[in-house]
């Protein structure tokens, strides 16, 4: 191994796919809602909602042109809501989170939300039509699989009658056959507290007897910080009928054309079950992909190599590193950076992953995290462009963006249950202004603000390049930071540089996280020329720096061949 090879990655084991997936997460409830007259903490009849039909041909063509390959439809599976209109049956408001409810408090795994349909009685047909439109546009569809928990009233609204644990459509109903006199039995779907009523942190008369364990805590008395709107599913670490019931859930949606599942909070679910599930589903649907929401980096290898996930969130790795680097620079100005705010963390994280890197799902936004343009993060969407160059272009791993990110959505509305926290609420009926403008712009019915349009053009250029270029989708990576620590103008804590190469194409990418423009010399060592098999020339060699100008909080790409 030659010196510097630890800064290069060439061979990946168990690579799931050759192309680089680019995933667009979208909440249909918000996407198609063009209502401007919004009232905080108000219902669907006042604030409105988007529908399946709003994921139309124009929207999907826009996503395809943007460079997207997969659309993650969030909040599709039927969940608890306080709504009694548009075909919805309300759950108890004492535990429903927000008027619209949480998309992760599932009331029926085999149904979609009636409010997303023009005709609630035909909601499954409208969902199927959306999936067909997605495929017709050359895109793949992802939905959530929530294996850890369900809503407190799961099964209450399943098609009746329920006989022998199955509803009128033949689908299994979790908990229907449980023995509620026992705290735990291997054949029970839930955990019970015999003789103890549920004590909610909210005031009211809601009665659950016996209490069931909540999604994140084994207790009949969840706190306000717990997932008190949910009930924990009992899997055991060995095969049970519950495993089969959940297998039916995934196969039901895969048979309707769903191409992938983003699996929620899998660290709370036995790995024995998840491994069995993935293997079993892929026997029936070999092309279906599984993405895990995982936060413990020490478990990454297990979830890929043993459990069989195609991709994992790299929230605790690259996302956290870029978050701290951005906030350290944007919010602290020219103040000295702490080590955890240094761009060196990008290299450290990358080296720690090794051959797991192509299985990481890189992102800068999702429904759980604060918006880049929020006052709590980078303040403006353009201030995150330096991070975009790294997260999107540094390796072959997939990349995800959250709807409105490309237009600089700030997430600074006070919708209702979700206050002004820098996030776009998933609990309320709402319509973010920048998302409305983006929707109208796509359909030729309105325009974006100048700053939004400029940011969108940058995203289009970067995403379309990444999705259409073999050097990004398949190329090797060489980190140049170790050999530029003392290069003129290069700040190891604020700048990041790397090379991508595939075939005859070689590009240099440089990011500047600082708040001032930077002119720098980038040295390419002889080890890089040798390892990348690039012949040195009079104009490009190990002794002659590449002179680069990088605007503040931005990045550049330079074609070296």
Q: Locations of the language-model features?
A:
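N-terminal structural segment of carbohydrate-active enzymes
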Residues: 1-140, 148-150, 155-159, 226, ...
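Short, flexible loop/turn elements at secondary-structure junctions
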Residues: 27-32, 77, 113-116, 147-149, ...
């Amino acid at each position: 191994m030659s010196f510097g090879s630890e800064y290069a990655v060439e061979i990946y084991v168990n690579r799931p796919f050759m192309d680089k997936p680019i995933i667009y997460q979208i909440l249909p409830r918000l996407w198609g809602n063009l209502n401007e007259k919004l009232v905080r903490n108000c219902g669907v009849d006042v604030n409105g909602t988007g529908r399946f039909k709003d994921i139309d041909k124009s929207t999907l063509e826009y996503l395809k042109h943007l460079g997207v390959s997969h659309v993650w439809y969030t909040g599709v599976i039927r969940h608890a809501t306080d709504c009694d209109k548009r075909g919805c049956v309300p759950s108890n408001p004492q535990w429903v989170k927000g008027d619209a409810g949480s998309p992760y408090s599932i009331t029926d795994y085999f149904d979609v939300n009636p409010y997303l349909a023009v005709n609630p009685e035909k909601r499954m047909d409208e969902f199927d039509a959306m999936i067909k439109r997605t495929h017709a546009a050359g895109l793949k569809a992802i939905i959530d699989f929530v294996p850890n928990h369900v809503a407190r009233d799961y099964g209450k609204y399943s098609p009746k009658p329920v006989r022998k644990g199955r509803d009128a459509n033949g689908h299994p109903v979790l908990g229907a056959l449980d023995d509620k006199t026992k705290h735990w039995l291997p054949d029970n779907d839930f955990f019970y507290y015999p003789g103890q009523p549920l004590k909610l942190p909210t005031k009211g008369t809601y009665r659950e007897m016996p209490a069931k364990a909540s999604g994140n805590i084994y207790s009949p008395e969840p706190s306000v910080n717990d997932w008190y709107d949910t009930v924990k599913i009992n899997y055991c670490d060995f095969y049970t009928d519950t495993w089969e019931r959940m297998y039916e859930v995934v196969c039901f949606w895969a048979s309707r054309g769903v191409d992938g599942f983003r699996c929620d909070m899998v660290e709370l679910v036995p790995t024995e079950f998840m491994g069995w599930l993935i293997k079993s589903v892929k026997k029936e649907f070999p092309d279906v992909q599984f993405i895990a929401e995982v936060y413990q980096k020490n478990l990454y290898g297990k979830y890929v190599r043993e459990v069989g996930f195609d991709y994992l969130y790299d929230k605790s790795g690259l996302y956290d590193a870029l978050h701290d680097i951005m906030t350290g620079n944007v919010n602290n100005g020219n103040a000295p950076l702490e080590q955890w705010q240094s761009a060196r963390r990008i290299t450290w994280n990358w080296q720690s992953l090794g051959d797991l890197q192509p299985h990481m799902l890189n992102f800068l936004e999702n429904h759980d995290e604060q918006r880049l343009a929020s006052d709590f993060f980078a303040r403006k969407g353009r201030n995150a462009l330096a991070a975009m160059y790294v997260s999107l272009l540094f390796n072959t791993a997939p990349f995800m963006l959250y709807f409105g990110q490309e237009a600089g959505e700030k997430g600074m509305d006070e919708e209702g249950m979700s206050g002004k926290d820098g996030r776009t609420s998933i609990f309320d009926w709402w319509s973010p202004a920048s998302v409305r403008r983006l929707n109208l712009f796509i359909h030729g019915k309105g325009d974006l603000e100048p700053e939004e349009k400029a940011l969108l053009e940058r995203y289009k250029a970067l995403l379309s390049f990444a999705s259409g270029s073999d050097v990004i989708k398949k190329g090797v990576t060489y980190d140049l930071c170790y050999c530029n620590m003392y290069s003129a103008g290069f700040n190891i804590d604020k700048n990041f540089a790397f090379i991508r190469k595939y075939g005859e194409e070689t590009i240099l990418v440089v990011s500047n996280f600082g708040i001032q423009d930077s002119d720098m010399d980038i040295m390419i060592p002889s080890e890089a020329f040798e390892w990348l098999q690039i012949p040195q020339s009079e104009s490009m060699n190990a002794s002659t720096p590449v002179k680069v100008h990088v605007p503040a909080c931005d990045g550049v790409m330079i074609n070296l061949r």
